[in-house]
């Protein structure tokens, strides 16, 4: 039985993940963490300042974090010191926060899966984008992403991963965020961010030449697609050797 604590228990993702785990035969939800205390699918939820003592009490195997960057930067080191495997889906981390998280995972000698998107489809799309970028390196490239009005980080973590892939394959290129006025295109990557309504997540990469346009895209219709991926990663990371993994490891993608 895999015992799980969810940080961000009352959030959109935390609630969906909690519901899924509560129905799994090989998993047990033992607690949650959020900015207010309460109960969550019949288990206690504590505030992050009590996390260390709480983990010592409930002894989870895996801690899942879908919070906000400042909270994750505090939660993950505490979980690593407690010897818990980690699933991190929080986006918007600064380089300094990510370095601190990575160091804590290594010092704690625990396994962790870190991804900006737990959708199986998006992880496959990332591999396709990398392959396309290698073969279409002289094409103009644009990245477009859209999310709900409440999303705090822009561009999204998923879009940042796309940009990282593109820079690795065809960079370095300047990233231009939106355009205004008379602007002649140079060697760059255009980035366009849309926020509105309750858009779950749309991402597209356009490769354009004078003769054709190739567009690779992914649309999530329900947040459950991310939650299911996170639960899959939870099952995978349990018992793994210490180290920092990605969803490509979970899905055995090259």
UniProtKB/Swiss-Prot annotation:
GO terms, biological process: diaminopimelate biosynthetic process; lysine biosynthetic process via diaminopimelate
Location of the active site: 147 (proton donor/acceptor), 151 (proton donor)
Enzymatic reactions: (S)-2,3,4,5-tetrahydrodipicolinate + NAD(+) + H2O = (2S,4S)-4-hydroxy-2,3,4,5-tetrahydrodipicolinate + NADH + H(+); (S)-2,3,4,5-tetrahydrodipicolinate + NADP(+) + H2O = (2S,4S)-4-hydroxy-2,3,4,5-tetrahydrodipicolinate + NADPH + H(+)
Entry-linked Pfam families: DapB_C, DapB_N
Signal peptide limits: none
Localisation: Cytoplasm
Pathway involvement of the protein, from the record: Amino-acid biosynthesis; L-lysine biosynthesis via DAP pathway; (S)-tetrahydrodipicolinate from L-aspartate: step 4/4
Keyword annotations from UniProtKB, A to Z: Amino-acid biosynthesis, Cytoplasm, Diaminopimelate biosynthesis, Lysine biosynthesis, NAD, NADP, Oxidoreductase
GO cellular component: cytoplasm
EC number: 1.17.1.8
Residues annotated to bind (S)-2,3,4,5-tetrahydrodipicolinate: 148, 157-158
Disulfides per UniProt: none
GO molecular function: 4-hydroxy-tetrahydrodipicolinate reductase; NAD binding; NADP binding; oxidoreductase activity, acting on CH or CH2 groups, NAD or NADP as acceptor
Main location: cytoplasm
Binding residues for NAD(+): 8-13, 89-91, 115-118
Protein residues bound to NADP(+): 36
Role of this protein: Catalyzes the conversion of 4-hydroxy-tetrahydrodipicolinate (HTPA) to tetrahydrodipicolinate.
Family statement drawn from the similarity comment of this UniProt entry: Belongs to the DapB family.
Protein's name according to its UniProt entry: 4-hydroxy-tetrahydrodipicolinate reductase
Organism: Methanospirillum hungatei JF-1 (strain ATCC 27890 / DSM 864 / NBRC 100397 / JF-1)
